[in-house]
Amino acid sequence: MEEPLQFGDGGRLFGILTLPSRSHRKAPGLPVFVFLNAGLLHRVGPRRLYVHLARDLSRMGFSSLRVDLAGKGDSPPRPGLTNQQSVAADYDEILRVLESRLARVPLILAGLCSGADNAIRLAPKDSRVVGLVLLDPVCSPDDGFSARAFVSKYTNTARYVAWLKRRFEAPTTQPRGSQEQIDPLTLRDAPTLEQLRDAPLEQLRSAFESIRERDGRVLSVFTQYALQYYNQAGQLARVLGVAGYQQFCTELFWPQAEHTYTLELHRRRLIDAIKTWAGGFIRSRIDVTRNIGTD
C-alpha cells in the first residue's frame, strides 16, 4: 500500500509511505527504510530505483518512506540554510511524521552518492538508525590504491578496443537524444584524490561504529564511478579499521555497473542484494520473538 504524505512546517515536504499488507508482515519490529535524495533527483531515485525497492521490500514486510528533501522534487527549498542545516531540519520532520504514523521505530537510511553522505552524517546522532545502505559512499584510498589503479589502467583491454573504435570507425548513427540522460556529476562533485587523502575519517568511522553499537548492519556498494577513489573489495574495511567490521558490514564492488545503474541487469542485481541484506533483519527479529516466547 502506498500513501502520499505532505508534512513538515507548512506541509513543505512531500513523500510516499509504502506499507506492507497484512499478509506480508513477517516479523514484528522491523526497521523502516528511509530513502534519501541524491543530488537533483527526486524521490523515485535513478530510473525509479527507489520505487521498485520500496515495493519489493514491502512484500518482505518492510515499510519505507521515499521523500523529497527541501529543494528537490515537490518540496520547496529552505531559504537561508546551508545544505547540511536543511537536511537536518528535513530529517527532524521525517522523524516526526514517521512517529505519528508508525510510532517510534528503528530506521535504515539508504542513499546514493550525496544521499549516502547525508546518511553517514545523520546516523551517529540518531539512536533509531540501525542500518545503512550506502551506494557509492566516499572512501579514502588505502596504501595499495595507486599501484592497483596503475596496473588496471594499462592492462585494461577494453581501453585499447575503445581507442581503436574511435580511431577507425566513422560515426554512423545519430546521438539518441530522446533517451533519459542522468549526469552523475549532478549528484555529487567527484572528490579528488588530494581531497580524499586530506578528509578526516572520523565522521565515516563514527557512523559505522554507531551502527555496530546498536547491533545493526551496513551495506556498502561501489560502482565504476568510485574507481576514482576505490578499486578493490575490502578497501573500505581496511581504511576504517572498525573492530568487528566483517560481522556487521557487507561491502560489494561492482566495477562494471554504472553510478546510476543504467542497465536493468545491474538495477535488478542491486535490488536483489539489498533484499538479501535486509533479510538479516527479519531473521534477527524472528529469533528475538522466539526467545521471548520461550522465556
For each feature predicted by the language model, list its residue ranges.
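Serine-hydrolase catalytic core
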Residues: 7-8, 51-53, 152, 157-293
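Alpha/beta-hydrolase
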Residues: 36-37, 69, 135, 222, ...
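Catalytic nucleophile-loop/oxyanion-hole region of alpha/beta-hydrolase
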Residues: 72-102
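N-terminal cap/lid segment of alpha/beta-hydrolase-fold proteins
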Residues: 1-31, 263
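Conserved alpha/beta-hydrolase
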Residues: 48-76
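Primarily recognizes the serine-hydrolase "nucleophile elbow" in alpha/beta-hydrolase
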Residues: 92-156, 210
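Active-site glycine-rich loops that stabilize anionic/oxyanionic intermediates
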Residues: 30, 36-45
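Alpha/beta-hydrolase active-site loop signature
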Residues: 40, 69-73, 139, 258
